[in-house]
Amino acid sequence: MAINKGKAWEDKFRQDWRRCFPNSFMFRLKDQMTGYKETSGNPCDFLCFPGNGELFLIECKEHKGASIPFTAIPQYDRLLEYSGLPGVRAGVVLWLSDKDRVFWISIEEMEKMVKDGKKSIGLKMFEDKSYNIIEIPSVKKRVYLDSDYTVLTDGKQEA
């Protein structure tokens, strides 16, 4: 049976998050299929609490090419429900697998993109700094990357 690269990416994300935040809470939400092709009713893949006072709602996405269309992020509307809640950071960890780069895009930044009429999230948006997209420091290891998610907390976590 072929390995789904996106699911394998989620496993790699889990390993890297736990390495970065060894004493943190991390919960993988089971996919609850809604009846639509490959669409879960959950707002995200993971609930993560690194111990810095913030709860992360993280959707993991793997995509080939230099951009991902919003149509490939069906969780957008559900994540948007958590925008602006104190202590909650909702967003997408995006691995552009052809480019070997990993990014964090908050739901607030995604909402700005949609309001600006954007149809996708692209590498160019990061490079020209038109939106606050955070690149996750990552090192290539064969197929996958070792990523350092502490950049999302500015290194702040409880001991």
Please place each PLM-identified region on the residue numbering.
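Charged phosphate-binding loop/patch that engages nucleotide di/tri-phosphates or the phosphate backbone
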Residues: 123-159
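Beta-rich catalytic cores
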Residues: 42
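Active-site-adjacent loop/helix micro-motif of nuclease/hydrolase catalytic cores
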Residues: 38, 56, 64-76
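Sequence/structural signature of beta-propeller domains
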Residues: 69, 105-109, 150, 154-157
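Acidic-basic catalytic patches of nuclease active cores, encompassing PD-(D/E)XK
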Residues: 1-37, 156-157
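Short, electropositive alpha-helical surface patch
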Residues: 108-125
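Nucleic-acid nuclease catalytic cores
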Residues: 83-112
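Conserved catalytic cores of phosphodiester-cleaving nucleases, focusing on short active-site segments
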Residues: 46-48, 52-65
